Design a protein with these regions (language model features):
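Hydrophobic, small-residue-rich alpha-helical packing segments that form membrane-like cores
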Residues: 167-279
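Bacterial Sec-dependent N-terminal signal peptides
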Residues: 3, 17-42, 193, 224, ...
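Membrane-proximal, proline-rich intrinsically disordered regions
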Residues: 22-72, 558, 562-579
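Conserved, well-structured interaction surfaces
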Residues: 40, 44-48, 52-57, 82-160, ...
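Bacterial N-terminal signal peptides
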Residues: 10-18
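Bacterial N-terminal signal peptides that target proteins for export
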Residues: 1-11
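Long, intrinsically disordered, low-complexity segments
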Residues: 25, 43, 99, 112-115, ...
């Protein structure tokens, strides 16, 4: 108590001294600050500031959402030095997920709303000072900002479902702390997001001179994604899935993917090229978060991709921390029989290819572009062949590494200490993703042959993606196109489209959201936990933490609102059900 009194008295004495002398400093203008009125008077710069938030993230709040979309699923393990490395472990087991654990959820919430605040300020700036721009440019910039705001809100809705809708009017009226998160149903919130994307679609050009800006085609693709999300239900398994299809929304998916299919975007010729930095902003890339190397933009470290800063392979990169690890179940999913997936029996036996030792078991070529495996070149470079030493904790997270989010090792990092960071763009929407959305909708409205045609186009590209980058695995690859008989019923077609989506988009942070949309998350994940905890690689077991894993429907479909957000304004927000 004496110590506390001394601290208080000392603080009061210091305050007296400060107040006695503060008159000398009150008239001094602060340095290195931004005059808000001046900033708001420059609408074009305010729009640029909103764009800047796209890549303004960190591993504790990665806007590409790899912890939320992948390590929560059957595609990936968390990785790292063990289950306590970062606070993401509850995501991979679900059973220990609470409103305060992991605390990274609060960072994600906060930074997504910071991004939305940027957008709202830009919209106010355009409304009040837009006459500094010509009429056409002003409308385009407004379309871009509303696209960005919808993009950030879509992420919030994906994670939490019930979130407060704070737009420029709420910002103007300073009513943020009076805006409830349960004011809108799932559908009402999604339709507000749709309204923003629709404004962008109606007012943006089909192409922009500056790479990285949103355009009409990106808005069409996002509209398709929104309508596809709504078409299956509200996300909770009791009211989601094949028995809850909204045909009108599925037709909207067809309508907007028609626009994408008729645009100048398309499939890159080789699957591997999609994930090489020299092909960023290619015809495959409809919208991507832009990143750069310091050698390109003349800055100290470049505009690095900090979302993936932990996801480099252990021992391969100077600071690769070995997070975001492909699962054995995912590797098994690439098995083929007669060139087609082994739907019923793919996971009966734990298997993996070994370089130079082909067996009767063949694999979809996309495996070798997606998963780094011991004995194989790391991202196509023989001088950087992976070994078992390239896994940080194989007794916990196995021996595989993710390849898509990293460049080739010879290209180096743009930042290398104490973490590595790369100049890889982050795809938000790529052409193949959108075409698979189209195939999904075609199945549900009864155009099974149209869906088969899309899937076979994608598989043909995969078949053609061996010689250029993975010739060393040619004797282990086998892939075939689907005959019409494989798409004979809606159930058969649905299975094949969903499987194709898993193979094509593996490790691209969408898997859990796909499972939830289809209404099959609990059955898929609880079966995965039961099998995966017994996985053995080269005689060694791992993934024992899945003994404690369980996905609870009517609860885990969405994440809990962060406790800190509930605490800030008690009674304003309603927690998601089950938490």
């Amino acid at each position: 108590m004496k110590t506390l009194n001394k601290i208080v008295l000392g603080t009061l004495s210091l305050c007296t001294l400060l107040f006695a002398s503060c008159d000398n400093y009150l008239t001094v203008e602060p340095k290195a600050t931004i005059d808000e009125d001046l900033a708001m008077s420059e609408p074009d710069k305010m729009v640029t500031a909103a764009y800047a938030r796209l890549g303004d993230d960190w591993y504790t709040y990665p806007f590409n959402m790899w912890p939320y979309g992948d390590i929560t699923s059957d595609d990936a393990y968390k990785g790292g030095s063990g289950t306590t490395d970062t606070n993401y472990h509850p995501f991979e087991v679900w059973s220990s997920l609470t409103s305060s654990s992991p605390d990274h959820m609060d960072e994600m919430w906060y930074h997504l709303y910071c991004a939305i605040s940027r957008c709202n300020r830009a919209l106010v700036s355009l409304a009040e000072h837009g006459d500094k721009l010509d009429a056409e440019t002003r409308k385009i910039r407004e379309g871009e900002v509303r696209f960005l705001r919808a993009h950030f809100y879509f992420k919030l809705a994906q994670i939490w479902n019930q979130v407060p809708w704070i737009d420029e009017e709420v910002y103007r009226n300073h009513t943020e702390e009076k805006t409830r998160n349960d004011a809108n149903t799932h559908e009402e919130l999604m339709l507000k997001i749709v309204d923003d994307f629709k404004f962008a679609y109606d007012n943006l050009p089909a192409s922009q001179a500056e790479g990285g800006r949103a355009n009409k085609i990106a808005a069409a693709a996002y509209l398709a994604k929104c309508y596809l999300t709504m078409a299956w239900g509200d996300g909770y398994e009791a009211t989601t899935g094949a028995d809850h299809i909204n045909p009108a929304y599925m037709q909207k998916v067809i309508e907007y993917t028609d626009v994408v299919a008729g645009s100048g975007y398309g499939y890159l010729e080789d699957f591997g090229d999609i994930f090489l930095p020299e092909y960023k902003n290619s015809k495959e890339s409809i919208f991507a978060v832009q990143h750069s190397d310091y050698k390109d933009d003349n800055t100290k470290y470049g505009r690095a991709n900090w979302s993936n800063m932990l996801n480099g392979c252990w021992g391969m990169w100077s600071c690769g921390w070995d997070f975001h690890k492909p699962s054995q179940n995912l590797v098994n999913a690439f098995k083929t029989e007669g060139g087609l997936p082994m739907f019923e029996h793919y996971n009966d036996k734990i298997d993996y290819p070994v370089n130079g030792a082909p067996t009767a078991q063949k694999w979809d070529p996309r495996l070798f572009h997606t998963v780094g495996m011991p004995t194989f070149p790391y991202k196509y470079e023989a001088e950087y062949t992976m070994t078992k030493d390239n896994s940080r904790t194989p007794n916990t997270y196995g021996y595989y590494a993710s390849l898509k989010e990293v460049p080739q090792r010879s290209k180096g990092e743009t930042f290398d200490n104490p973490w590595q960071a790369f100049a890889m763009n982050d795809y938000v929407l790529r052409y193949t993703d959108v075409m698979l959305m189209r195939a999904e909708a075609m199945v549900e409205i009864g155009n099974l042959e149209g869906a088969r045609s899309i899937v076979n186009d994608i598989r043909q590209r995969a078949k053609n993606s061996v010689a250029k980058h993975i010739s060393y695995a040619a004797d282990q690859c086998e892939i075939a196109l689907y005959p019409a008989s494989d798409f004979g019923t809606k159930e058969d077609a649905r299975l094949r489209v969903q499987w194709e989506r898993r193979l094509e988009l593996a490790m691209e942070n969408e898997r859990f959201f796909d499972l939830r949309r289809w209404g099959i998350a609990s059955q898929t994940l609880n079966k995965f936990f039961e099998v995966e905890k017994n996985s053995v690689y080269d005689g060694q077991t791992y993934a024992q933490y899945y003994n404690d894993a369980h996905f609870t429907p009517a609860k885990n479909e969405y994440f809990p609102l962060p406790y800190i957000q509930l605490f800030y304004v008690p009674g304003l927000y309603t927690q998601n059900k089950g938490y």
